[in-house]
From Swiss-Prot:
InterPro entries: Cyt_c552 (IPR003321), Cyt_c_NO2Rdtase_formate-dep (IPR017570), Multihaem_cyt_sf (IPR036280). The lineage of its organism: Bacteria, Pseudomonadati, Bacteroidota, Bacteroidia, Bacteroidales. This is Cytochrome c-552. Pathway: Nitrogen metabolism; nitrate reduction (assimilation). PROSITE patterns: MULTIHEME_CYTC. PANTHER family: CYTOCHROME C-552, CYTOCHROME C-552 RESPIRATORY NITRITE REDUCTASE. Catalyzes the reduction of nitrite to ammonia, consuming six electrons in the process. Its cofactor is Ca(2+); heme c. Heme c 5 binds at residues 290, 328, 331-332. CDD domains: NrfA-like. One of its GO terms (molecular function) is nitrite reductase (cytochrome, ammonia-forming) activity. Substrate binds at residues 231, 279.
Length: 494
């Protein structure tokens, strides 16, 4: 017997169908509207741009909204509980870090990063690049410029990638003058997202992956992964390389470096072969729930805005905490205060572990130096140095990542906890070495309660560093700018 729907069931089915059709229609309309907006912009360009255009202001007439929001990366007014867009002297706040980086340029100067508009200025100003008075002087290679400017792909094209990397940092000072901008992430002709730095492409190739097959949503993270990653300068040519061949976890990259016999520097106190993590933001973010659910970097750091009927990406790249209504609340219904506190809770817990690890690791370096001074042999110190290397790699991997405590809180806690364990093991191993040498008392600790005391303890002449830097900024940088201006390399707002 045929079963008929009751009247109310029929109407319910009809209503449900209409709702589904309406929603699908709205989605289709939104897609078509977005496509029409993009088509309209592309068909009404006022300036034709071809090739690598490093002067960001050349894009303003075609993309005024994107350009104006990009200019806002110069803003330094936002501050959250732990970060923001202000330059904060981290060594002043955490003098233990001076000890951890003894023998490396970061012990001289390390501040929290500002927005992309400050990329060139901040690099010139940091003590880490020294004060080179000629093109062939200075402690750093030209590789250090790689992520700072759209002038980089221009010069790589002109010089060849190998030649770009192997020069001195100062040799390109007159060429790399425009801060991170349009051409770093977009093809000038059509503004499609593209990869402008070879290291990411090469890392994919070594893993048997084809980056050209990436989806549009994946590209909204991969353009960031050109720079916001762990990397190192390989060989005498200082070739920029991502250590992803074995994987992208902290242990995978450590295994890669161990196999290569690589160390960024030898620690001045402990003599441990130290790995300096850069900023493994992409790697850590991929281990978190948001990336695992398909959320891209741009979804949270460059949310869409609407103006005059036009929908566009906000190019004021910054912390999502500065715009919770357009980031977190797009998906989450909780209040701004609740969502902000959710982030702070994760950061507080990671920070607690970080503080303990920094304290123990600083002591481990000092105690290792004490053991050397007491006559310890390389064979006796072998295990100590390995443990210190492992502990510091885990500390730096977690600390150097921007936003890691939010991106992947469980992974950050695991990494820092493992680092703390390694640091404690290193201290215990040193105590055993000292006992064999006949010393069983506590190792005397120097006073490194301030940045100045810590820098003095590791032998830095900061007055000389600052004097040399001032001379460099007042003489060499103006020469670079003058030559760039004469060669028409500078954007109007630089």
């Amino acid at each position: 017997m045929e079963k008929k729907l009751k009247s109310w069931q029929g109407w319910l089915l009809f209503g449900g169908t209409m709702v589904v059709v309406f929603v699908l229609g709205m989605i289709a309309a939104s897609v078509n509207e977005r496509h029409a907006e993009v088509t309209s912009v592309m068909n009404n360009k006022k300036t034709e741009i071809t090739g690598i255009e490093a002067r960001n202001d050349k894009f303003e007439s075609n993309y005024p909204r994107e350009y104006q929001t990009w200019e806002a990366t110069a803003d330094t007014s936002f501050k959250s509980l732990y970060n923001g867009n202000q330059a904060v002297d981290v060594l002043e706040a955490r003098p233990e870090m001076v000890i951890l980086w003894a023998g490396y340029a970061f012990s001289k100067d390390y501040s929290t990063p500002r927005g992309h508009m400050h990329a060139i200025e901040d690099m010139r100003n940091t003590l880490r690049v020294g004060a080179p008075m000629t093109e062939n002087e200075g402690p750093q290679p030209a590789t250090c410029w790689t992520c700072k400017s759209p002038d980089v792909p221009r010069m790589m094209q002109a010089m060849g990638v190998d030649n770009f990397y192997k020069g001195k940092w100062a040799s390109l000072g007159k060429e790399i003058v425009n801060p991170i901008g349009c051409a770093d992430c977009h093809e000038p002709e059509n503004m499609n997202l593209h990869i402008s730095r070879p290291a990411l492409i090469e890392a994919f190739q070594r893993q048997g992956k084809d980056i050209t097959k990436a989806t549009q949503q994946e590209m909204r993270s991969l353009v960031c992964a050109q720079c916001h990653v762990e990397y190192y300068f390989k060989g005498d040519g200082k070739y920029l390389t991502f250590p992803w061949d074995k994987g992208s976890t902290v242990e995978d990259m450590e295994a890669y470096y161990d196999e290569a016999g690589f160390a960024d520097y030898t620690h001045k106190l402990s003599r441990a072969p130290i790995l300096k993590a850069q900023h493994p933001d992409y790697e850590i973010s991929q281990m978190g729930i948001h990336a695992q659910r398909g959320v891209s970097c741009a979804d949270c750091h460059m949310p869409y805005k609407s103006e005059g009927g036009v929908k566009y990406s906000d190019h004021h790249i910054q912390s999502p905490l500065a715009m919770i209504d357009r980031t977190c609340q797009v998906c989450h219904r909780e209040s701004e205060e609740t969502l902000r506190n959710n982030v702070y809770e994760r950061q507080n817990k990671a920070n607690e572990m970080r503080n303990r690890l920094e304290t123990e690791l600083a002591k481990a370096h000092v105690e290792a130096k004490f053991a050397w001074d007491k006559g310890a042999t390389e064979d006796q110190m072998k295990d100590v140095l390995k443990l210190i290397r492992q502990a510091q790699w885990r500390w730096d991997f977690g600390v150097a990542s921007h936003g890691g405590a939010f991106h992947a809180p469980q992974e950050i806690q695991r990494i820092l906890g493992n680092g703390l364990d390694k640091a404690m093991q290193a201290r215990l191993a040193t105590a055993k070495v000292l006992a064999k040498l006949g010393y069983t008392d506590d190792v005397p600790m120097p006073d490194f309660s301030t940045k100045e005391k810590a820098q003095q303890y590791i032998g830095l002449d900061m007055a000389a560093e600052r004097t040399a830097k001032e001379k460099f900024l007042n003489t060499i940088v103006p020469q670079w700018m003058k030559e760039a201006q004469e060669n028409n390399r500078l954007a109007k707002n630089i």
